[in-house]
C-alpha cells in the first residue's frame, strides 16, 4: 500500500501536478525548493510534501518526464548525425525477407505453386550466411528499452554572500509627495554640483521655509537627502578608472551579472526570513510571558519547627543591645547552670576570654611554673565547663580588666600637624620630630639625585610652606585657640547648628512597642515645645527691640514747656523777623503763621493726636512746676524740625508697629491645656454683623471642627470661611482652640474668602 500510486481525477489539481512535474523534471530540485517556499501555505501544492496521497503520482510523473526528455535528446542527436550503413542494412533485410528458405520448408512456404517437380537447390553456405546477417540486422533494428538512470545529484547549494551596496539606487519613501520628491532631487543635484558651501547658504537663507525643512539634521528626510546627494556626486564626479571597470568581464558577462543578481535576491530573501523568524521568536516569548501565572506556586518541601528546638537558642536581642554591642551567650551549659544570657555565665565567659587574650600577650615572659599554676587555678575556677575547654583556658593572677570607656584624667597634650608625615605630633616633641624628618628627607634626596648645590636649593625651597598652607594653618589654629583669637564664624555656625535628636527605631519585638511609642511621643512633644519656646523668644526679642526703639525716639523728642507754640525767635529785637518768615499781615489768605496749625475738619483727629500708646510704653511727663494742657496729654510731642528726614523717620516707624504679630507670643498649647481644661464657649460673629452664634467646643478641638459647626448653622462652606480673632491672624484649620489661647466668651469673626484679590 505504501507504493500504491493514486491518480487524481481530471481537473485543475491534475493539471497543476502534471505541469509542476514537467517543470521539475526540466529545471531540477532548485525549482522545487522555490515552489515549496513560495507556495508552502497553499493547499493546492500539498502534493509536493511527503505523506500526501498524490506524492507518489507526482514523483512518477517526474521520472516519466525525465525519461521522455532523454529520449527526445537522443533522437535529436541521431537526426543531427545520420549514418549510411543503417540504410544498407534495411535494404538487405527486405530482400532477404522475400527469399525462400532452403529444403522442403521452402516449397511449402512458397507463395505460388509450381507445376514442375524439379527444384533447384540453393547452396547451403549462402543460406546460412544470409540467416546470420538477418539476425544481426534484426538485433540492430529492434529498439532496446533500457532502464532510465537516476539524474545526477545537483551541485551543492551556494550560500549567498553580502552583495555590494547599491550606489545609484535609493528606495523612495512611501509617505513623500511628488512635490517634495522633485524639490529634494533638484536641491540634491545642485548641492552635489556646487558643494557644501551652497548647502550652507541655502540652509541659512531658507531656514524659515517649510519646503526646505529636509535641510535640517533633525528632519526625518535628512538622511535620505544626504544619501541622494552622495549618489549624485558620484555620478557628476565619477571616480578614476570607472570606464575600464565597466568594460571588465565582471560587468560585461551576462552570466556573471545574472549570478550577481541571483545572489542579491537570495541574500535579501534570507534577511527577510531571519527578520521574520526573529519577530516570531519575540512574539512567542511575549506569549509565554503573558501566559505565566505569577500567583501560582509549588510546595517543594515542608519544614516543621517544634517548640523544643527553641530551647537551645539564646533569647532575642533588643535594639538597645545591638547598639551597645552586647553579645549574649546562650547555650545548654549555661542554661543548665541556671545562668541566662545576661547573667553571671556571660560575665564569666567574657572574663575568661579576656584572661586568655592577656595570657597570649605575656606568654613569652612567663615561666613554666607560672603556667602550671595558672592551669591548676583554671581547673579549680572553671569546673562547670567541659573538659575540652579547660585545657585552653589560661588565667593570669591579679588581672585588671581594661575599661576603654573610662577616660584618663591626665591632661591632654597639644598637638600639631606635621607637613611631612601628616600626623599629629605633640608640641614638646615637634622640634625633635622635624629634625628627624629633615634628616630623612636629605638622605632620601641624596640617594635619588646625588645632592648638589641645585638639589640643596630645591630642598630648601621645597621645605618652605606655601602661602595657602600658611593661611590654612593659621585659620585652623585660630579656630582651636578661641581664648586668643575669639570665636570665629565657623565655630559660631557649628554652635548654632541644633543637635539632632536620636531617632526612635523599633527593634521588631512586640514587648518594646509601648516603649517606642512613648519615646516617639516624648520626642514629638519636646520638638513642639522647643519650637514654641523659640518662637516665644523671637517674639519677645522683637517686642523688646520695638519698645527700645520707641523709647529712644521719645527720648530724642523731649516734652516742651508750656509755651510750646511759641518759638525761640521771640527773643529777637523788636521789628526783626527770622529769615524766611513773613509778617502776619502779608500772609496769603488760607495760610496760617508758622507754628499755628489749622483746625481739622469736624469728626477727624488732629494730626498731632494719636491713639493711646500700647501697654508698657511710658509717656514723658513735664518738668516740675510745668503743666501740660489737657489737649496735649494724649498727644506726642510735636516735631519742631520740619525737614524730610523727620517725616521719613515717622513713616518708617508706623508700619513696624502696624505689622506687630501677636501669634508669636502665644502660650504653648500644652501649658494652656493644663491651665484651661474646661470647654470653651465662643461667640462667632459674621463679618456683615448679620448673625451672632454661640458655639461650645473643647480646647483640643481644631479650627476645622469650628468651621463645621458654623456650616451647620448658616450653610457657608468650610473652604469659603475666613476666621479671625482679635489680635490674631487668620485661624488655620490644623491648629486647635488651645493653640490660639481662646477663652470663653472670646469673639471670632467669620468672613468670606475672596479669590483673585490682592493680599492685604
Curated annotation (Swiss-Prot):
SMART domains linked to this entry: SWAP, UBQ
GO annotation terms (biological process): mRNA cis splicing, via spliceosome; mRNA splicing, via spliceosome
Record's compositionally biased regions (Acidic residues): 360-373
Ranges of Low complexity composition bias in the record: 77-147, 374-385, 454-464, 544-557, 629-649
Main location: nucleus
CDD domains: Ubl_SF3a120 (cd01800)
Entry annotated with the keyword Nucleus: yes
Basic and acidic residues bias spans: 487-496
Chain coiled-coil ranges: 259-290
Compartments in which it is found: Nucleus
Region (Required and sufficient for nuclear import): 655-677
Location of region: Disordered: 77-165, 309-348, 360-393, 442-464, 487-509, 544-583, 624-657
Protein's UniProt keywords contain Repeat: yes
Keywords carried by this UniProt record: Coiled coil, mRNA processing, mRNA splicing, Nucleus, Repeat, Spliceosome
Known role: Involved in pre-mRNA splicing as a component of the splicing factor SF3A complex that contributes to the assembly of the 17S U2 snRNP, and the subsequent assembly of the spliceosome.
Designated name of the protein: Probable splicing factor 3A subunit 1
Provenance organism: Dictyostelium discoideum
Name of the gene this protein is made from: sf3a1
